[in-house]
Amino acid sequence: MKANNFKVAGWVATAAVVAFVAEIILTFMSQVPAYSEVASPRLVSLALAIHIALASYAMHRLRGFLNERFEFHRADVLIPLLVGGGIALGLAVISSRFYFEPAISAILMIMIGVPLGVVSVLFGYRLLAVNGAISGYKKPFAYIHMLAPICFLSVIFAPLGLLLLLAGQILLALMFFTDESPELEFV
């Protein structure tokens, strides 16, 4: 039996979940006048930067996980695009808090978010082809990657998109902690 080489990635993904929850709470606190001094834009941006760094590493390790455990290479190009797009979107959000007008921020988010959403949907679709259930986490993780961008594009369902992203981060951490080997396929 092979040792699980992805436990560190699982812990990093777990830390990304904690940072994501902290970021969401701080963002909401910054909108309430009584707490706006506690949750300053710098603190919210720091939480976002930590979350993005941790989540980016976890997604990067997902590529190795899929390659090593399942010999799955159909997402090798999409995962770096997701990581790069997530970093670009995070930097855009951080810089929009300090430097940009709301209209310019919205245009920037759309310019980065729409292509990132398309890549995410394609990634979710391709992930369904993995030979194995990844302890039952494959389908929910794939469907989250297909549904979350649609929620964000609808704007009305953006809070649901946030919850889906959080659930996706949790599933990613759980996938790294599994010791499942790929199912044998007889032809």
Where are these regions (language model features)?
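Hydrophobic, aromatic-enriched alpha-helical segments typical of multi-pass transmembrane helices
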Residues: 1-187
